[in-house]
Amino acid sequence: MVDLLAKVDYRIVIVAFIVALIIAIVVWTIAYIEYRKLLRQRRIDRLIKRTRERAEDSGNESDGDTEELSTMVDMGNLRLLDVNDL
C-alpha cells in the first residue's frame, strides 16, 4: 500500500483536485440558475393568481398587476384573462 502511494505523483492529485473544483463550481452554478428560475416562476404564478382573483371580484382585470406581470415575462401586451373557458 505504501508503494502504491509512493508511485502517485503529486501533480496528478493537484489536477484531480482542480477538475473536481471546476465540476463543483459548474454544478452549483447550474443549481443557482435553476433556483432563480423557480423563484421567478413562483412570483409570476402568484401575480397571475392575484390578477384572476381581482378580475373575479371586480369584474375587470387589475391593470397594475397585469402590467407588472407583463414586464416580468418581457411581453408588451399580456392578455391572461381573455380565455373563453374561465
From Swiss-Prot:
The cellular component terms of Gene Ontology attached to this UniProt record, alphabetical and capped at eight, are:
host cell membrane; membrane
Query: Phosphoserine is carried by which residues?
Result: S58, S62
Concerning PTM, the database record says: Phosphorylated by host CK2. This phosphorylation is necessary for interaction with human BTRC and degradation of CD4.
One GO BP on record is: symbiont-mediated-mediated suppression of host tetherin activity
> Could you tell me what this protein does?
Enhances virion budding by targeting host CD4 and Tetherin/BST2 to proteasome degradation. Degradation of CD4 prevents any unwanted premature interactions between viral Env and its host receptor CD4 in the endoplasmic reticulum. Degradation of antiretroviral protein Tetherin/BST2 is important for virion budding, as BST2 tethers new viral particles to the host cell membrane. Mechanistically, Vpu bridges either CD4 or BST2 to BTRC, a substrate recognition subunit of the Skp1/Cullin/F-box protein E3 ubiquitin ligase, induces their ubiquitination and subsequent proteasomal degradation.
Which HAMAP family would you find in this protein's record?
HIV_VPU
Which family does the entry's similarity section mention? Belongs to the HIV-1 VPU protein family.
What name does UniProt use for this protein? Answer: Protein Vpu
Which organism is the protein's source? Answer: Human immunodeficiency virus type 1 group M subtype C (isolate ETH2220) (HIV-1)
What gene makes this protein?
Answer: vpu
